[in-house]
Amino acid sequence: MDRGQSLIIPPLFDGTNYAYWKVRMRAFLQSLDEKVWQAIEIGWTKPKEVLADWGEAKIKAVNFNSRALNALFSVVTNEEFKKISSTTTAKEAWTILQTTYKGTKAVKDSKF
């Protein structure tokens, strides 16, 4: 990032107005790097081999996951953090928030 360039941080998510927060958060994550967003959309799986054997591509992938997970942890209230604090992947944290506040397809279908 260029020195002096400001970064717009998404609003703190407190469990309300999820649809608005989700759009802002996605744009924020993509502004960090498209691969940060991909860590949420596609997910990341920890390789079976030891860290020393991961190679550059796997190290980059874990770093994108870590950046995404850190971003999510940083923009939620303590109450929301409790819901996602035990996750190790950004996709898992995002899915928990999405299921909690948007619902699953089955939940949506049951509302009709």
Where in this protein do the model-derived segments appear?
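N-terminal Lys/Arg-enriched interaction segments
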Residues: 1-112
